[in-house]
Amino acid sequence: SGSKTAEIGDGCFGVPIDHIGSTSGMGCGRPRPKPTPGGS
């Protein structure tokens, strides 16, 4: 779950601006990346 923290900084989810996108993944503008090891 370590990679999850990196994704938050990406502006995908975890940010107040992407409150809705955090669930639908639309706030990213692209398919939300999966927390894969070595992905950071």
From Swiss-Prot:
It holds the Pfam family ANP. GO terms for cellular component: extracellular region. Keywords: Disulfide bond, Hypotensive agent, Metalloenzyme inhibitor, Metalloprotease inhibitor, Protease inhibitor, Secreted, Toxin, Vasoactive, Vasodilator. One of its GO terms (biological process) is regulation of blood pressure. It is found in: Secreted. Disulfide bonds join C12-C28. Expressed by the venom gland. Residues 1-40 are annotated as: Disordered. Residues 1-8 form a propeptide. PROSITE patterns: NATRIURETIC_PEPTIDE (PS00263). Coiled coil: none annotated. Belongs to the natriuretic peptide family. Negative results: recombinant PaNP-c does not demonstrate any stimulation of cGMP production via the natriuretic peptide receptor-A (NPR1) and does not inhibit platelet aggregation. This is Natriuretic peptide PaNP-c. It comes from Pseudechis australis.
